[in-house]
């Protein structure tokens, strides 16, 4: 009973002293750690007084004097200070937990590291994984979390063509931009149209490139095919040429008036009996532009799937196919019950990332026809996907930065949500055996 009372008393004492970080550690005879914690606290307090309070105030007000206060800089600086403050709060909680834990160990008669040398050795031994990954976490904070927070805060403001700092101040407007996207007529119609085409584009282009990649891999890996190395090189050509050059070349080939498709390929087909094809409006008719985009992405994307599936096929034991042949299985049955499950099991995560990549595939949409032809409203073209619409919202004659930020967040929620569901449902992350 006395031992339990002593333990509780020591933990309470350490917790109270840890209200000022470092004092609890000093009370536990960990002088070096306590001084380090005090130094960190003092450094944060100094930073908070010199810069932090002003930055957090600026984040809340976004300035008060047009021409002098730069609202965007205040938002960015305040976000950075908010992250620094959150990191210190995590350190503060760790400080209390560490002090109480050490006090409990001492009260229980367990050995506690008190000298600087012992604590450094302990950190190098038990804390090596954390020290090794610390740079990655720091980079993640400033490369991922910081931009995401800035984007979120911009989406909650009225940052647009009429509110560009420092001449005009930015104001907080809450979730108005999100509500406008869903309920304001012009934005709602555009968002629905662009989102619908984005989904169609993602599903069609990605599925076709996956199917073509699997078919070509199966074709080349058949025993009766001779000159497999030549075929493998040929199928890699679309991947070897930079996508930028390929897209621009296709853009010229599909030109309505002087492109190779209308000027040479279609007339060549028209020499066949009973064939009379008119010139196709590849870049002036939205339907044919979308068709061309899907075909081009299929051409660009299938070599990657082909290479990946080829590796999987070569790893499948031949005995499985021999046993299936003895049992009388046809080629379709062997593919359905052996080949396809093996491919899906090994490549499902990569297949999912192909869909997420094409969902945000800005380059082909913009380079081929700049999102045209025609208009879907609110600055979007008839073939714009969400990511290219965001680009136009921020670079047009009347930029809408806050709306673009809101659409960016919606894209993130959609992609992350669908990806998490797909990854969770994928057997590639389970322990199931592929029969």
Swiss-Prot record:
Gene Ontology annotations of biological process type: maltodextrin transmembrane transport
Predominant localisation class: membrane
Keyword list, A-Z: Cell membrane, Membrane, Polysaccharide transport, Sugar transport, Transmembrane, Transmembrane helix, Transport
Gene3D superfamilies: MetI-like
InterPro entries: MetI-like (IPR000515), MetI-like_sf (IPR035906)
Alphabetized PROSITE patterns for the sequence: ABC_TM1
GO CC list: maltose transport complex
Subcellular location field: Cell membrane
Pfam families documented for this protein: BPD_transp_1
Primary role: Part of the ABC transporter complex involved in maltodextrin import. Probably responsible for the translocation of the substrate across the membrane.
Family: Belongs to the binding-protein-dependent transport system permease family. MalFG subfamily.
Subunit structure: The complex is composed of two ATP-binding proteins (MsmX), two transmembrane proteins (MdxF and MdxG) and a solute-binding protein (MdxE).
Protein name: Maltodextrin transport system permease protein MdxF
């Amino acid at each position: 009973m006395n031992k339990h009372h002593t333990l509780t008393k020591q933990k309470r004492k350490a917790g109270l002293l840890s209200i000022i970080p470092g004092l609890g550690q000093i009370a536990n005879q960990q002088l070096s750690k306590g001084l380090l914690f005090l130094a960190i606290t003092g450094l944060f307090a100094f930073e908070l007084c010199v810069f932090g309070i002003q930055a957090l105030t600026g984040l809340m007000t976004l300035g008060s004097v047009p021409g002098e206060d730069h609202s965007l800089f205040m938002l960015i600086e305040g976000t950075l200070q908010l992250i620094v403050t959150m990191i210190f709060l995590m350190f503060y909680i760790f400080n209390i937990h560490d002090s109480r834990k050490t006090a409990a160990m001492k009260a229980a008669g367990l050995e506690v590291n008190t000298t600087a040398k012992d604590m450094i050795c302990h950190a190098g031994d038990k804390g090596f994984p954390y020290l090794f990954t610390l740079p990655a976490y720091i980079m993640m904070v400033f490369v991922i979390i910081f931009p995401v927070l800035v984007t979120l805060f911009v989406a909650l403001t009225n940052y647009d063509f009429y509110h560009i700092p420092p001449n005009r101040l930015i104001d907080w407007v809450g979730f108005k931009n999100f509500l406008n996207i869903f309920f304001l007529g012009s934005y709602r119609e555009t968002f629905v149209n662009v989102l619908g085409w984005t989904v169609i584009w993602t599903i069609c282009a990605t599925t076709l490139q996956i199917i073509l990649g699997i078919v070509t891999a199966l074709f080349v890996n058949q025993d009766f095919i001779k000159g497999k190395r030549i075929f493998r090189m040929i199928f890699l050509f679309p991947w070897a040429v930079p996508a930028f050059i390929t897209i621009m070349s296709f853009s010229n080939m599909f030109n309505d008036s002087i492109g190779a498709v209308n000027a040479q390929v279609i007339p060549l087909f028209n020499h066949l009996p009973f064939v009379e094809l008119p010139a196709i409006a590849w870049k002036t008719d939205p339907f044919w532009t979308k068709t061309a985009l899907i075909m081009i992405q299929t051409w660009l994307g299938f070599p990657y799937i082909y290479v990946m599936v080829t590796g999987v096929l070569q790893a499948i034991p031949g005995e499985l196919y021999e046993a299936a042949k003895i049992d009388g299985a046809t080629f379709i049955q062997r593919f359905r019950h052996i080949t396809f499950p093996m491919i899906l099991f090994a490549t499902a995560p990569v297949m999912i990332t192909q869909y997420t990549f094409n969902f945000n595939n800005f380059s082909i949409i913009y380079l081929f026809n700049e999102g045209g032809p025609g208009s879907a409203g609110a600055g979007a073209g008839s073939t714009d996907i969400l990511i290219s619409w965001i680009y136009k919202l921020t670079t047009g004659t009347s930029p809408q930065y806050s709306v673009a930020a809101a659409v960016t967040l919606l894209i993130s929620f959609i992609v992350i949500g669908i990806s998490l569901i797909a990854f969770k449902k994928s057997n590639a992350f389970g322990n199931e055996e592929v029969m």
